[in-house]
Amino acid sequence: GIGKIKSVVAELCFNTSQTGYQETLTDPSYAKQIINFTFPHIGIVGTNNEDLESNEIFAEGCIINQPIDNYSNWRAQKNLDDFLIYHNTPGITGIDTRYLTKKLSKEGAKKVALINFGENKKKLENIKESLKMWGGLENLDLATIVSTKNH
C-alpha cells in the first residue's frame, strides 16, 4: 500500500491523465471518491505546494499500479507516499488499474471499500456494514464539504 494506513468506503472512479496526480487528488470534484489512476507510474515528479488545487485531499483514497518513490523534479518537496500520509489519505498499489478502468467504463461507478489488511475481524465487519449502508454520492451536499469556511 501507500499513504495512510486506514480503511475507507467511497465511490470508485478513474482518471486517465499521465501527469497531474497531485492536482487530481486535491481537486474538490473528487470528494468522497477513490481515484483509480490508469497511468501505470504515479509519483515520478513528487509533490509540492505550488501544484495544489486546494489545501487538502478531498478524495477518500487512490489506487495506483506502480508508485514511484524516487521522484525526479527540482520543484518536489515530498514523495507521493509522504504527501498521502500528511493528508491522511490511504492508497493501494499493485492493482491492474487499466483493467479496472475498462470495467468501470463499461459498468459505471461502484461503491467500494479500500481495506487495510491489518484490520481486526470486528472492524472488518463494521467496514462491510458501512459499505452496505453507504448510499453513494447521490443527494450528498458535496459543496458544503469542499467549500471554504466563512471567517
Each PLM stretch: what is its role?
Residues 1-151:
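RNA-binding accessory domains that recognize and position tRNA/RNA substrates
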